[in-house]
Amino acid sequence: MPYRMSRQAYAETYGPTVGDRIRLADTELFIQVEQDFTTYGDEVKFGGGKVIRDGMGQSPIANADGAVDLVITNALILDWWGIVKADIGIKDGKIFKIGKAGNPYIQDHVDIIIGPGTEALAGEGMILTAGGIDTHIHFICPQQIEVAIASGITTMIGGGTGPATGTNATTCTPGPWNMYRMLQAADAFPMNLGFLGKGNASQPQGLVEQIFAGAIGLKLHEDWGTTPATIDTCLTVADEYDVQVAIHTDTLNEAGFVEDTIAAFKNRAIHTYHTEGAGGGHAPDIIKVCGQANVLPSSTNPTRPYTVNTLDEHLDMLMVCHHLDPAIAEDVAFAESRIRRETIAAEDILHDLGAFSMIASDSQAMGRVGEVIIRTWQTSHKMKVQRGSLTGDAEADNLRAKRYVAKYTINPAITHGIAQYVGSVEAGKLADLCLWRPAFFGVKPEIVIKGGMIAWSQMGDANASIPTPQPVHMRPMFGSFAGARNATSLTFVSQAALEREIPQQLGLRKSAVAVSGTRQLTKQDMKLNDALPHIEVDSESYEVRADGELLTCEPATVLPMAQRYFLF
């Protein structure tokens, strides 16, 4: 017998469905459900008197015969490929299926089997995203990893050895011995980790040995000398061993100008860090490289978005991070040359146009490791307020939302050759997922799933009679401990290191997998962020133009996802 529910009652019971709109946190961004994979009247839901019971929504089918390990019911997926309502089945730590869950003996169109071996996680009224990927990590302290995963990051790529002066300034894990020790340390964390070697060398031998040791890429940094010769050598080695190169270019233009650096690229794929330039790079016009087809450009979060405080805080941060002396006039001039309101304002707009493809942190080296996701959505909000809806976003902000979520999920995964494992909510990938209450979206995840197991979660007083009494905050869960963290996380290495059995020699307990497919990439591979405008920068005024149009915007005086959510 049919039963009719109001749209509001349905959303409150099973979550939003096609046509419903959801506000993201306290921003001016709204997303609209595009498709619903569940079946009206045949939804599954767990609880007393609910559907997932034996003989109803739960079948007697064993896990060995096809039932999943975990089902997330009625969640709203937000990913670069769509905004859809679905059940999500997880099996053996991977996403098994996005579709309709239930008991195939009594329900139609079931492609996710719930059985006696299936755990249930209520996704009704929740937003599900892929775990974030931060590709600009200075591994200065291990506590960064706790902060990152608590914010929704599940993969970290960068370099360092701890609070050494070199690591404070550059994202490099230099040399085999340091690489081995960091790979061994990676076993201690419920986080996918990959390390970049130092790429600054005019001869290849010192670069090759780092790749053999496990480096998944090489980092060129001006503090080690990013000259045209080192750029060419580094990219040549990367091409041979299929690893990515990340670059922080020559702020002082000592070894050449931006045109010389572009020439040294020789149309080879490269990930340009903080491409606007406040984080470092040819002053004042490094931003030009985002119009090059072989350049995969990212921002770091100190300049995201442009606010009334952005310029003031940058000078002190820069002096500390790059070991500069405020008593030396040349050091102060070096710092001031990198901080330009005009290029930072243009960066906002270039993100909105899809010309900048990624956002990362620059952790403790001017950036905040726990704010990649917040800063991304604050930028999106600011652009919605200042520039209006994107073409095609009439009733909701779906295109803009998909463009911005791609900046910290699929695009960094593609760039660093790990998209076959992580970076999106798609079948076959590691189940690194974040569940968000819409009111807290992008700010504080409700649950972080790592390799199919809950690793971190909002949790109340452990001595309380129920899980919810205050103080409720992010805490590590069972997936973060002992063998579980090793079974649910990956360590990324080079194919050359796998062939030399480096993980076995080091006794690594995590699964080690190789990066691949990094050298033939172009900007066109960046999902929803593949624009190639012709960029011009006035050397006197620093004004930025894209295809002849002046790019400028006002700094924000207030932002969402800020004080409303935090006491400190």
Curated annotation (Swiss-Prot):
- Origin, by domain of life? Bacteria
Where is it predominantly found? Answer: cytoplasm
GO MF terms listed in the record are: nickel cation binding; urease activity
- Which reactions is this enzyme annotated as catalysing? urea + 2 H2O + H(+) = hydrogencarbonate + 2 NH4(+)
Domain Urease residues, every copy: 131-568
Give residues annotated as binding Ni(2+) 2.
K219, H248, H274
What family does the entry list?
A: Belongs to the metallo-dependent hydrolases superfamily. Urease alpha subunit family.
Recorded protein name is: Urease subunit alpha
Q: Which organism is it from?
A: Nostoc sp. (strain PCC 7120 / SAG 25.82 / UTEX 2576)
**Gene that encodes it:** ureC
